[in-house]
Amino acid sequence: MDCYGVDMCILTSAFNMTNDLNVQIVKNNPGKFVALAYGEKYRQQVQRTGEDWSAAAAAKELDDLLATGHFVGIGEGFPQDPTLGAKHRRIDIHSRLDEIAHFMAVARKYKVPVRYHVGLTMGYTTGFCRGSGANPETYNPMWVHDLAIEWPDVQIIFEHGGVQAWWWDKWYEECLNVAAATDNVYLETGTWWTELYDKPLRDPNIGAKKLLWGTDWGSSIPVEWQPGQKPETYVCQRRKTPPVRHQVDMFGWSLKQIGRLNIPQDDLNLILGGNAARLYRIKLPLTRLFPFVDDESS
């Protein structure tokens, strides 16, 4: 953060990170971090005991966490049955949206945003309902049309804006479609190369007010380089190569991509922090640091 001039970070639960650890980081560094809640202990309980997973029980854990006042949102993604892949049980859109409704209700209760995961890193196999990382909605951003209509007062943020890794942009296009057609859907952009910013910034139904810069974990997603091609650089894991052992400088790469944009500084400031501060209701030292996005003249 000091290296790149980042004032504050929103912590999500990564591998081996826990809610308790994130809360401790927040407490130990006043004004530097806020944290999102993730259903971690119930998931571990299901894996340990073999009991049937339930969305209601997972939502109860999120409710208890948010009730502490230590968290500002829900993420990364929504809780899901950790044994889904092992069971080889298919789950359809209607069943999964019914599960997600439990988490959306908790978000509505506490007036916090949710994060909807879209994308995969390519280096390890995961499926719609197969494999250890089975996650049905991660391949289906268009489902958010229904969520946004059913829960118009809950802000939904697309993790990775449809591009977690690789050069493919199909899910990115679908995420743009949803964001442009709804008022409560936003896009996180940390793994976008520069050209991906062009369409949403030009779209009057998206614009800078719906984009949030952030990064993925970075510890094992290298940057690929293909000179003369589009994109010239992108993040991606290689399937036949072991995970890298150093800290990939994803932060520097990501900031370089957004730094190439020749847009008004106020718009850039919204993407780099103003939108996150607004959605997560983060207290700022001054009240007029960023444009007021509800003012169409701004």
What are these regions, as identified by a protein language model?
Residues 1, 9, 35, 74, ...:
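Divalent metal-coordination and catalytic microenvironments
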Residues 1, 26-30, 66, 148-149, ...:
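N-terminal cationic-hydrophobic initiation segments that often serve targeting/anchoring roles
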Residues 1-8, 206, 210, 221-298:
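Mid-to-C-terminal alpha-helical segments outside catalytic/metal-binding sites
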Residues 1-28, 296:
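An N-terminally biased module of ancient metal coordination in phosphate/nucleic-acid-related enzymes
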Residues 16-124:
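Active-site gating/metal-coordination segments in enzymes
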Residues 19-20, 54-60, 96-100, 137-144, ...:
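Well-ordered, non-membrane alpha-helical segments in soluble/globular domains
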Residues 45-50, 86-90, 128-133, 223-246:
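Acidic/histidine-rich helix-loop elements
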Residues 88-213, 218-220, 224:
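Catalytic pocket-lining loop regions of alpha/beta-barrel enzymes
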